[in-house]
Amino acid sequence: VSQKRKTVTLYKDNFRYTLKHISDIIPEANQAIKTLERFGEVIEKALINLTIMEFEDLVTLFEVTTILQKFTLMMRVAEDIEKYIVELGVEGRLIQTQFDEITGDLKKEVDALIRDYYNDDKGQVDIQIIFGKLREYEEEEIEIEEMAFILGYKKRYETLDQKVVPKGYRLLSRIKRLAAKDIETLVSNFDGLTAIVDAREDEL
């Protein structure tokens, strides 16, 4: 603690970090929240368009990877905001509330999106591992071919034109009456969302 400079510096091994004053952090946090909100709006619009394409059976890997690309950039902003919230302490409650409102449902949607399009016949996917892989990239913008590879597809540009069919997790999760086990049963018994939508009542 430097009383002369009115600063607090944290040390751990070779790591050194000087805490900022609250009056400096709040404007930065508010600006980051606005950026996060813009990302959220763009992704939500893309998900609406994706839903329309899913019902028309027109989805290609390009649409899916583009959404994931945007979400990865959004995650980086989210990580910065989480640091601001920690530094602000009780002063960061409003920022925390705004953060939760923006990211809460959207993260669930993207979780389901990954489950829908992960290229594994067994339907086994560890969401945390996928998110971990996405965080490994430090580039300003991850190439969508890289996104395709993370989802289990070949890392080639022409792969992006490949038509893909969702398993149904994302849209089925919106039906409040369906428990998680019911969704798993439907996904296991049918070959994709189109088959579920086209199924007769006695088949469901």
Region spans (language model):
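Charged, amphipathic alpha-helical linkers/stalks
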Residues: 17-90
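Secondary-structure junction/capping motif
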Residues: 9-10, 14-21, 57-60, 143, ...
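Long, highly charged, low-complexity intrinsically disordered interaction regions
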Residues: 30, 37-38, 42, 79-201
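A generic structural signal for ordered alpha-helices
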Residues: 7, 14, 52, 59, ...
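Extended, alpha-helix-rich binding/interface surfaces that flank or overlap catalytic cores
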Residues: 2-6, 10-17, 130, 139
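Extracellular LysM carbohydrate-binding repeats and other cell-envelope/extracellular binding modules
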Residues: 204
